[in-house]
A protein has these predicted regions:
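Canonical P-loop GTPase G-domain recognition
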Residues: 123, 133-193
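Long insertion/accessory domains within large nucleic-acid-processing enzymes
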Residues: 258-266, 398, 444, 455-459, ...
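Conserved nucleotide-binding/hydrolysis modules and their immediate coupling elements
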Residues: 207-310, 318-322, 485, 494-544, ...
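Helix N-cap motif at beta-to-alpha junctions
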Residues: 229-231, 281-282, 361-367, 410-413, ...
Length: 603
């Protein structure tokens, strides 16, 4: 295909502003699906966790045809934790669709991704989505976006961006709010007229930067990226410029381009198209694939450094090996280092002990998605509380500061400000949002956000939303008070019974019900007081000849609190761990023996 007929764009936005829904609508209206075909919502979110969480985790490619123009579309994650996915795919495109919710306006991740796009000189198209939402203020949001562009030092050319008003859910777009439209035609036309064809050298030796990796059971590792120069053919010998200027040789076995959601095998591809290739078994993200006789490396984009670290270690509890398939340090080590091949924001190094590993990422969600993936693959492991990564700058200890935006009901504002103030949060802006809600911005140490989300949802009766993104490293802000309540810890192994739990529930909130296998040192609840409490939840009522005046079977248990993986990771203190297995998520003390723990506490 002539590269004049190609447009490469990425869709960028804050989480939940409708990127994947817009891609769905573009695919439908370019007749990728048959008229009678049943298509699930958010078809691009193909990963199990993406479907369950309702978010995009991995960036993905697709393409649509509009007339004789091929539009390659890259759908990107909106969560700040997966920012590394966005940063590297921006190198493969020539323009971006900046999607902004007509109700919420520009949010933290919108700012961060736009900043990187403008720095790369990409041409923006602004799409104001959800114009049909009650309370939407599209004109006000356009003004916010213009202010944001000016703040981020956009060039005059970038400031001259087209604005399209859309409802991705209903599949309509218009250039003016007063227009009556029934489809996305004007968005297709705007993309074709605004985004330039790829600036590539048609002639010359082939050259391509690998920006993503996929895997296929039949052909092995697949490299994904944009062909920057020349032509690539099946069977041609190539040179691979890897890390530290290492050059290896290989041969292209298969070539693919995207047509809708399908990969189509081709014999030859010209510069400018986003392609996939197989045949190079040790290819990695950031490598450059070149003509065999002309190895020239393309510099890879700088990925932001991790801000949070956790310790992953071998499960050494009493139930170790009973529920998982991969339980040894070798299994965990191999899996973590394999993850580095495609998860460019991740850092892994060996821990202080032979069976532990320090894993660093962009946030709790980034690491919890990895843990959940490993759990589903059959791994058993222990994980520690997340810790922020400190840096020394000019001899001063510095910590990561986040920009936090919360939207809360008006009657909860005082409580939220007070709680975030205790966590060293500094309020920088406050304005009314929709009816009965207030939007507040804080600058807060990353330490202050860890463990706060569950408390925030309780304080706002489940109505509040919070979003945060890394802002800068600043001098250490001082100590932050940890969890104020202690835990209820089992001190006898066995099976929990109603009688034992009934006595325990007076002391606080329980995490387990009857009939659950427990071991000494396992956390079974949250104490209502500040200290930890060891209790026997396996204790049965002794039988006697004395008849009870009341009914013996009227022991009513309060339903236990359900602990998801994210809640468990947020909940634990420094002396606690989360035991993750394919079947269960348990909380436990680092030191299981009760007497040893009491001795350590007295020191």
């Amino acid at each position: 295909m002539n590269n004049k007929n190609i447009r490469n764009i990425a869709i960028i936005a804050h989480v939940d502003h409708g990127k994947t829904t817009l891609v769905d609508a573009l695919l439908r209206q370019s007749h990728v699906f048959r008229e009678n075909e049943q298509v699930q919502e958010r078809v691009m979110d193909s990963n199990d966790q993406e479907k369950e969480r309702g978010i995009t985790i991995l960036s993905k490619n697709t393409s649509v045809m509009h007339g004789d123009i091929k539009i390659n579309i890259v759908d990107t994650p909106g969560h700040a934790d997966f920012g590394g996915e966005v940063e590297r795919v921006l190198k493969t495109v020539d323009g971006v669709l900046l999607l902004v919710d007509a109700f919420e306006g520009a949010m933290p991740q919108t700012r961060e991704v736009l900043k990187k796009s403008l720095a790369l000189g990409l041409k923006p198209i602004v799409v104001i989505n959800k114009i049909d939402r009650p309370g939407a203020q599209p004109e006000k949001v356009v003004d916010q976006v213009i202010e944001l562009f000016i703040e981020l030092n956009a060039t005059d050319e970038q400031l001259d961006f087209p604005v399209v008003y859309a409802s991705a859910k209903n599949g309509i777009a218009k250039m003016d709010l007063a227009d009556e439209t029934t489809d996305l035609s004007c968005l297709f036309e705007t993309i074709i007229n605004t985004i330039e064809p790829p600036k590539c050298e048609i002639e010359g030796p082939a050259q391509m930067l690998v920006s993503n990796i996929d895997y296929d059971d039949y052909v092995g590792r697949i490299g994904i990226g944009r062909l920057e120069r020349g032509t690539m053919k099946v069977g041609m010998p190539v040179s691979i410029c890897g890390k530290e200027d290492k050059i290896t040789q290989g041969r292209i076995a298969k070539l693919y381009t995207h047509v809708g959601l399908k990969k189509v095998e081709v014999e030859e591809v010209g510069a400018g198209d986003i392609i996939e290739f197989a045949g190079l078994s040790d290819i990695n993200i950031g490598d450059t694939v070149c003509d065999f006789e002309h190895p020239e490396k393309i510099p890879f984009v700088d990925i932001d450094e991790p801000t949070v670290t956790m310790t992953f270690s071998v499960n050494n509890g009493p139930f170790a090996g009973k529920e998982g398939q991969f339980v040894t340090s070798r299994h965990i080590r191999d899996r973590l280092y394999k993850e580095l091949e495609r998860n460019v924001s991740l850092r892994v190094k060996d821990g202080e002990t032979p069976d532990s590993f320090e894993v660093s990422g962009r946030g709790e969600l980034h690491l919890s998605v990895l843990i959940e993936t490993m759990r589903r693959e059959g791994f058993e492991l222990l994980v520690s509380r997340p810790k922020v990564i400190f840096k020394e700058i000019d001899g001063v200890k510095c910590e990561p500061i986040e920009l936090l935006v919360v939207n809360v009901p008006d009657d909860c504002v005082g409580n939220v400000i007070e709680k975030l103030g205790r966590r060293k949060g500094e309020m920088v802006n406050m304005e009314p949002a929709e009816a009965g809600h207030t939007k507040i911005e804080f600058r807060i140490p990353a330490r202050g956000i860890i463990g706060y989300r569950t408390e925030f949802l309780t304080d706002t009766k489940g109505e509040g939303t919070m979003n945060h993104i890394f802002d800068a490293y600043e001098p250490y802000k001082g100590d932050i008070q940890a969890r104020v309540r202690g835990t209820i810890v089992a001190f006898e192994p066995g099976k929990s019974v109603t009688y034992g739990l009934y006595n325990a529930q007076d002391k606080g909130d329980l995490f387990i019900g009857p009939g659950v296998d427990v071991y000494e040192g396992m956390i079974v609840g949250l104490n209502s007081r500040g200290e930890d409490l060891a209790i026997n939840v396996c204790k049965e009522k002794h039988l006697t000849n004395t008849r009870a005046s009341g009914s013996d079977d009227a022991l009513r248990l309060v339903p236990p609190l359900q602990m998801s993986l994210e809640k468990a990771i947020e909940f634990i203190a420094e002396d606690e761990l989360v035991e993750v297995t394919p079947k269960n998520i348990r909380l436990r003390k680092k030191t299981l023996d009760t007497k040893t723990r009491e001795r350590e506490a007295r020191r």
